[in-house]
Amino acid sequence: MFILLILLSGISPTMNAMIAPVTYSVRGKVIDRQSRQPVAYANVFVVGIPGKGASTDSLGTFKIEQVPPGIYSLEASCIGYQTVSTPEYIVSASTPFIEIEMEEDANLLNTVVVVPSPFRRSIESPVSMRIIGLQEIEKSPGANRDVSRIVRSYPGVSFSPIGYRNDLIVRGGSPSENRFYMDGIEIPNINHFATQGASGGPVSIVNADLIREITFYTGAFPANRSGALSSVLDFRLKDGNPDKQAFKATIGASEVSLSGAGHLGQRTTYLFSARQSYLQLLFKALGLPFLPNFIDGQFKTKTRFNEHSELTLLGLVGIDKMKLNTDEKGEDAEYLLSYLPTIHQETFTLGASYRHYNGRHVQSLILSHNYLNNRNLKYRNNDDSSEDNLTLRLRSTEQKTTLRFENQTRLGAWTLKEGAELNNSIYTNHSRQRLYGSHSGTLSIYETSLNIFGWGAFFSSNYTTADKRLALSAGIRMDGNTYNRKMRQLWKQFSPRLSASYKLSEQWTLSGSTGLYHQLPPYTALGYKDNEGQYLNKNLKYMQVFESSLGVDWHLQDRFMVSAEGFFKRYSRMPLSLQDNIPLACKGNDYGVTGNKLKQPDVIMSTGIIENPSAPVAEQRYKMKYLKQESGTILPTLGITVEF
């Protein structure tokens, strides 16, 4: 008995250690946003865990011990600075090094005011904007960490009627009217098996492990984000870890992945991801007649030359292949195999962003290049033994090179932002398609190419009163290119915008925005030629939409918010297919190529009312009508949609 007690006494501490809760430390640094100098003796707390925090040392660094695993944001406060909340971070064995930027506030020199800010708003976009944090990305039901599937539950967002695709229809618009940015670099499409001339696809290229947060705009677009009529998804990626090397291997529902974060020396950090799908194995085991396969990769490096200069390099690549499973038998399989082509797509984006902090000024120089190669191939009875069986061979490419400069200046209550950009777009299409009927199986040959130089400029100013009750923003943008004479004239694409927000009380805020936005029609429409090699759509103009939004927010103790927002949109200069009289806004939510037909302008109008609680509960109602200019008749294109 005595020996048993000794053994138990020895085992007990070991078991207690084994069942003790696992905790981690959170390390980071607090710096001044303008001077880039460390902020000493600032208080940093973990939001949601009372009393859990630390103070920065003389170098601005902090370390918070014994934090339970989970998703948290941090809050920093210091005398003379505005209290700031960070994006959400995952606390785990690979918790990243967190850098917090604080902004001076002369009104707070004699006191420290801690005001949590879970509902961040932009002065430029006080309505029609939502920030997607890690909590939503990781826990959104049914989304599988796919951003396009997360936002489909938001008010004003409808999903493709083809339910397995990520085509976003925002406030009655088209899938081609959405724009994507990643750390300030434009990404033409974020999905595998993309529809050329639109956006969307069944699976996202972006690995959620690398995302810090996403800003989703459904209106009130910032002046430095061009070419959007319906929405902008603005990704912010994490930075690499300057302290240690961390790697993660994952087996998902459709792919295996490897990601990592670390540092290369003392000045450079890196982040990467590589994924390989095994969908083709699953589809073959299920007896499906098509076998999709994709590979994607992503990387980001950041080099800090000194306190005032940094260079970010970013890359995103996707490779897609869809083969046919000709071994599959049965009536349904044979029907699909009779018309489905094999698909090969390669897409990539490479970009570099140099940022210089110069006191009140921040200058950014961004250079990027994106590329898409889309190929479809089909033989009669899937017999490729002879070229006589060829029914379709399509190869189409799109590429765009962009150089953009931005400068931001802070002058007390004012923030000014101005910039300019140059771009060069190249589009080619080489197709062979067998025509039947009156053409008696003739092999049609279609070739076209397009080379466009474009330019743009923008300016915006934000103002906030000393008591933070009133915020105003005004901006303009102008774009042009060499496609035709009207598009060369910048003032034809003059895009003004105005927004305002007023705090009626501590709980109520009234906000609104109005603006005119322009977007270039898809290259597939601009480059369409007839049999004589003449461009048929030379009379096209930039597509245009006028949008106004008005919203009201009600806050309860800064932890609960209910908002209601109404919007009105009026489209004009919208291309219309003369083949089926369907506007471009109603197309682009399927595989293949859209837009390569003859077009003419039309007008579309939509009105709506949306209610948007901060919790994942929402309702939307909108109605859209299409006005055919020749007859004046109104044809419904989208009905009323209700979503809970």
Where is each model-derived feature located?
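Periplasmic N-terminal accessory/gating domains of Gram-negative outer-membrane beta-barrel systems
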Residues: E88-I90, V115, F119-F221, V232-D234, ...
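Surface-exposed extracellular loop regions of Gram-negative outer-membrane beta-barrel proteins
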Residues: N191, D327-D332, T428-L435, E506-S548, ...
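Face-selective signature of the C-terminal outer-membrane beta-barrel domain
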Residues: K302-D320, P341-M487, K503, S563
